[in-house]
Amino acid sequence: MEKISDLIECIAYEKNLPKEMISKVIQGCLLKMAQNELDPLARYLVVEENKQLQLIQLVEVLEDGDERLVNDPSKYISLSKAKEMDPSVKIKDELSYSLSLESMKQGAINRLFKDLQYQLEKALEDSHFEAFQKRLNSVLMGQVILVDHNQNTFIEIEQQFQGVLSMRHRIKGESFKVGDSIKAVLTQVKRTKKGLLLELSRTTPKMLEALLELEVPEIKDKEIEIIHCARIPGNRAKVSFFSHNARIDPIGAAVGVKGVRINAISNELNKENIDCIEYSNVPEIYITLALAPAKILSVEIKKIPIEELNAEEKESIQERFIVNNHLQKAKVRLLDIEKSKAIGKGGVNVCLASMLTGYHIEFETIPSVKENAENESEKETPKVGVEALESLFKN
């Protein structure tokens, strides 16, 4: 028993586990062995004294002649026999017997150590599982060890764990080879027969948020905060920031001097263009900022009950625009010459603005001043030549 106790500190150091956890595992294995190898009906207890573990069997003192002495002899002892061991003992008292591993069969000892090894490995896996659960949505870095025929990229992380970056979680246009170093966000921790499997992603908005936190110390220090993040991975992204410190410009902090911070993040994300905007809790202002670089004239917010939408509208509207059974809709007025900027190439700008703000955006265009002027001039035929000269002298 002393040898097992001495192992606790050694195992705790080697496996980087708390000594209390190791002790609990060993105690559980000892109790299991006693019930399997000695008597499954008996009551056992493991106690720790002077850094040594003792396996103890507990018996209750009963009056002589009690039927339970015959039915469950492993749980009870008669008063007369108990007094031979301790004259001061009384009925319903508990006596304890110390059991020795040396008195057990070698097969039982072997099974104990085999079970102990299994339980320790399980405890170690549980510890790692809990540790990685706390690191969800954080950036992990590793080295590519395999790219399979489905283009799933397997990554060695911290020299002992395996991560997988599936093709659908890779930025479009990216390719990796064995030996490459990769940064990716941890999205899920799975248990498999081979151990833990860490699922990674480079396309989730959390990847951009995590990189910003690493690159911008003001975010980690909670002086500025990321409010919303929307991405079309590898193409473009929009991030809104709020400053908790009046002296800090959130956009300047995020972008960095000469764009050094945001450019470093963009390079990590395969040259993804990142728009940084200041958050506003006024929806009209927020939507106006989100649609930059387009210049917006006005924004009208409407919250339409779902039951008022027709079948076609219900089918086309995305769930993220529905809040409390109301469609969040923004009617944006702008000059016609600004509409292409607001929509963006392939609709990217308006799509990201909608994702960022949570509003379904519709546009209403207004003819530009230049166009109005041209229309007015077309109504009058310009006078030229002699006719123009004559008009100068008319009263």
Curated annotation (Swiss-Prot):
Subcellular location: Cytoplasm
A GO cellular-component term linked to this record: cytosol
Pfam families to which the protein is assigned, alphabetical: KH_5, KH_NusA_C, NusA_N
Stored Gene3D superfamilies: 3.30.300.20, Nucleic acid-binding proteins, NusA, N-terminal domain
Keyword Metal-binding: no
GO molecular function, one term: RNA binding
Domain KH: 243-291, 331-378
Keywords from the UniProt entry: Cytoplasm, Repeat, RNA-binding, Transcription, Transcription antitermination, Transcription regulation, Transcription termination
Residue span(s) of domain S1 motif: 137-201
Family matches, as PROSITE patterns: S1 (PS50126)
Superkingdom as given in the UniProt entry: Bacteria
Subunit field text: Monomer. Binds directly to the core enzyme of the DNA-dependent RNA polymerase and to nascent RNA.
NCBIfam families: NusA (TIGR01953)
HAMAP family reported in the protein's UniProt record: NusA_B
Function in brief: Participates in both transcription termination and antitermination.
Protein name according to UniProt: Transcription termination/antitermination protein NusA
Lineage: Bacteria, Pseudomonadati, Campylobacterota, Epsilonproteobacteria, Campylobacterales
Gene designation per UniProt: nusA
